[in-house]
Swiss-Prot record:
The lineage of its organism: Bacteria, Bacillati, Bacillota, Bacilli, Bacillales. Manganese or magnesium. Binds 1 divalent metal ion per monomer in the absence of substrate. May bind a second metal ion after substrate binding. It catalyses: Endonucleolytic cleavage to 5'-phosphomonoester. It comes from Lysinibacillus sphaericus (strain C3-41). One of its GO terms (biological process) is DNA replication, removal of RNA primer. This is Ribonuclease HIII. Keywords: Cytoplasm, Endonuclease, Hydrolase, Magnesium, Metal-binding, Nuclease. GO terms for cellular component: cytoplasm; ribonuclease H2 complex.
């Protein structure tokens, strides 16, 4: 199915609504101000000025109103992105994406989210405020996460510190843990959305394809069909950007919980300030407590030990 998005002015919006008035259909979705249905084309207009055409006649109808908007369709479209070459118009396709956060933070969990965004919801998700999470504040991500969870089929996994440390002590690398979580989150989401299937799956790349699947060689169920890997994947499809936000929101919620237990606001990251805070907690509440809220194998542990 073809999907085309145009940016149109307020005047053109009025013309579009008049032209398709006889084909009007009611569509109750955030950001939608008009929708119409032709035998071979669905037309959706958004408050943002975006006009989306879907179906066999999308190109024909879009040509009436403007120039087709160019969208990123491969890793070369995003400066610095590395990984698989994506299909043309990938950004407009129905994609299941996954991303993780918390991997570089001494305190708190590692979280992974997988999110399915069908082509019909891409503009809705954009209307809800999704961008590359690195461009958004934590407070903003907390704010929009509930709407995103309600709008999309998804799975969010949290690997808390006790389990993380247990796996690490058994010889699991962080890369292996991430691969297992991505695979599980993708599998969960595919199960929830069945019998519908995505056109493609995009994983924000943290390991080469061969390394990733080697991590999963002992897993019973491995998601492999139509899977692409790319760095900066959150800029290549809104599904990964949404996954990044949901993973971050889950991480922040868990950090709130741990901060309440610790009696102070835990710092993010793994800086020297984190070392100082860790040493303070160690002196006051002991090694076992500190271990229960941290990724114990990080270098911060030994740095904090020297400060006690």
């Amino acid at each position: 199915m073809s999907n085309i998005v145009l940016s149109i002015s307020t005047n053109i919006q009025k013309e579009v609504m008049a032209y398709y008035a006889a084909n009007y259909i009611e569509r109750k979705a955030a950001g939608v101000i008009f929708a119409a249905k032709l035998p071979d084309t669905s037309i959706t207009m958004y408050k943002s000025g975006k006009l989306m055409f879907q179906g066999g006649g999308a190109e024909r109808e879009a040509a009436r109103w403007g120039t087709i908007e160019k969208t990123p369709n491969s890793k070369s479209a995003i400066i610095g992105a590395k990984g698989d070459t994506l299909p043309d118009q990938f950004a407009l396709m129905s994609v299941l994406g996954s991303d993780e956060t918390g991997t570089g933070d001494y305190f708190g969990p590692m979280t992974v989210a997988a999110v399915y965004v069908p082509s019909s919801k891409i503009e809705l998700i954009n209307e809800l405020g999704v961008k590359d999470s690195k461009m958004l504040s934590d407070d903003y991500m907390r704010k929009i996460a509930p709407d995103l969870r309600a709008a999309c089929v998804h799975s969010v996994l949290i690997l808390r510190n006790e389990k993380y440390n247990s796996l690490q002590a058994k010889g699991y690398s962080q890369g292996k843990m991430k691969a297992m979580m991505h695979n599980k989150a993708l599998h969960n989401t595919l199960a929830k959305m069945a019998p519908e299937t995505p056109e493609y799956i995009l994983i924000d790349q943290f390991a080469e394809r061969g390394v990733y699947y080697n991590y999963l060689k002992n897993e019973r169920e491995i998601v492999q069909e139509s899977v692409y890997f790319s760095t900066k994947a959150e800029q290549l499809h809104v599904a990964v950007a949404t996954a990044s936000i949901l993973a971050r929101a889950a991480f922040l919620k868990e950090m709130d919980r741990l901060s309440d237990i610790a009696g102070l606001e835990l710092m993010k990251g793994a800086s020297n300030k984190v070392d100082v805070q860790a040493a303070r907690i160690w002196r006051k509440q002991g090694e076992e407590f500190l271990r229960s809220i941290t990724k114990w194998h990080f270098a911060n542990t030994e740095k904090a030990r020297k400060m006690i």
